[in-house]
């Protein structure tokens, strides 16, 4: 199966959540693998792919397909560096990796609607749909997340994609909206959906509990 870690925006913690899940599944003895097909903003090495692949003891080169220098959308980078992103190659590579693992975690770049190609638009929702993947959406815990999270949910729904759930990441106990965001988001969506919360600096038990709850929800999805 493919668990696709996407997000409402960039910089909300997709890689961090991916590391938590990979470490948890590996420690459970589950054959888990990871790939981030496109990473942008790369200086010397792709930091996201490197962080997660190092947990698996694999070279980062096995965990990324396209690397771009500037911190822009994949499509903008492809124009800037004059590289044609082969989406069929990405899908083929991911499907091949899926066959070799019990769980393949795929990490997107930026949010769910970030363009990979245009005319026609190919974004991360397109990849999720094409791969029959199960999307997990990472979002900020604080002010602004209701708008971003609901729009992300609504966009996925318009593509007939139901997310496994949302992780409201970075709860810091100071900003007041964080205490109500989870249940208000649930009310806005108007159907049951998993919404988890993770502290800004979670301890090991919190990280394990999050991964365990996500893993259990997959079995019941």
UniProtKB/Swiss-Prot annotation:
<feature type="binding site">
    <location>
        <position position="48"/>
    </location>
    <ligand>
        <name>Mg(2+)</name>
    </ligand>
</feature>
<feature type="binding site">
    <location>
        <position position="48"/>
    </location>
    <ligand>
        <name>ATP</name>
    </ligand>
</feature>
<keyword id="KW-0460">Magnesium</keyword>
<protein>
    <recommendedName>
        <fullName>ATP-dependent dethiobiotin synthetase BioD</fullName>
        <ecNumber>6.3.3.3</ecNumber>
    </recommendedName>
</protein>
<comment type="pathway">
    <text>Cofactor biosynthesis; biotin biosynthesis; biotin from 7,8-diaminononanoate: step 1/2.</text>
</comment>
<feature type="binding site">
    <location>
        <begin position="107"/>
        <end position="110"/>
    </location>
    <ligand>
        <name>ATP</name>
    </ligand>
</feature>
<dbReference type="InterPro" id="IPR004472">
    <property type="entry name" value="DTB_synth_BioD"/>
</dbReference>
<dbReference type="GO" id="GO:0000287">
    <property type="term" value="F:magnesium ion binding"/>
</dbReference>
<dbReference type="InterPro" id="IPR027417">
    <property type="entry name" value="P-loop_NTPase"/>
</dbReference>
<dbReference type="Pfam" id="PF13500">
    <property type="entry name" value="AAA_26"/>
</dbReference>
<feature type="active site">
    <location>
        <position position="36"/>
    </location>
</feature>
<keyword id="KW-0067">ATP-binding</keyword>
<keyword id="KW-0436">Ligase</keyword>
<comment type="function">
    <text>Catalyzes a mechanistically unusual reaction, the ATP-dependent insertion of CO2 between the N7 and N8 nitrogen atoms of 7,8-diaminopelargonic acid (DAPA, also called 7,8-diammoniononanoate) to form a ureido ring.</text>
</comment>
<comment type="subunit">
    <text>Homodimer.</text>
</comment>
<keyword id="KW-0093">Biotin biosynthesis</keyword>
<dbReference type="GO" id="GO:0009102">
    <property type="term" value="P:biotin biosynthetic process"/>
</dbReference>
<feature type="binding site">
    <location>
        <position position="15"/>
    </location>
    <ligand>
        <name>Mg(2+)</name>
    </ligand>
</feature>
<comment type="similarity">
    <text>Belongs to the dethiobiotin synthetase family.</text>
</comment>
<feature type="binding site">
    <location>
        <begin position="11"/>
        <end position="16"/>
    </location>
    <ligand>
        <name>ATP</name>
    </ligand>
</feature>
<feature type="binding site">
    <location>
        <position position="40"/>
    </location>
    <ligand>
        <name>substrate</name>
    </ligand>
</feature>
<keyword id="KW-0479">Metal-binding</keyword>
<dbReference type="GO" id="GO:0005524">
    <property type="term" value="F:ATP binding"/>
</dbReference>
<dbReference type="GO" id="GO:0004141">
    <property type="term" value="F:dethiobiotin synthase activity"/>
</dbReference>
<dbReference type="GO" id="GO:0005829">
    <property type="term" value="C:cytosol"/>
</dbReference>
<keyword id="KW-0963">Cytoplasm</keyword>
<feature type="binding site">
    <location>
        <position position="107"/>
    </location>
    <ligand>
        <name>Mg(2+)</name>
    </ligand>
</feature>
<keyword id="KW-0547">Nucleotide-binding</keyword>
């Amino acid at each position: 199966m493919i668990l696709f870690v996407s997000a409402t925006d960039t910089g909300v913690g997709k890689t961090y959540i991916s590391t938590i899940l990979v470490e948890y599944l590996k420690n459970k003895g589950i054959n888990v693998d990871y790939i981030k097909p496109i990473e942008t903003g790369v200086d010397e090495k792709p930091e996201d792919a490197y962080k997660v692949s190092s947990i698996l003891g694999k070279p980062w080169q096995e965990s990324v397909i396209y690397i771009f220098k500037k911190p822009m959308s994949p499509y903008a980078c492809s124009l800037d560096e004059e590289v044609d992103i082969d989406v069929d190659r990405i899908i083929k590579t991911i499907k091949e990796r899926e066959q070799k693992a019990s769980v393949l975690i795929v990490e997107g770049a930026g949010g769910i609607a970030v363009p990979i190609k245009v005319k026609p638009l190919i974004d991360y929702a397109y990849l999720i749909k094409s791969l029959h993947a199960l999307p997990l959406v990472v979002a900020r815990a604080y002010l602004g997340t209701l708008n971003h999270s609901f729009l992300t949910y609504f966009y996925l729904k318009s593509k007939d994609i139901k997310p496994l759930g949302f992780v409201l990441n970075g709860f810091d106990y100071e900003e007041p909206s964080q205490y109500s965001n989870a249940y208000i988001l649930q009310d806005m969506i108007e159907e049951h959906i998993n919404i988890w919360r993770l502290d800004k600096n979670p301890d090991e038990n919190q990280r394990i509990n999050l991964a365990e709850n996500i893993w259990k929800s997959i079995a019941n999805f």
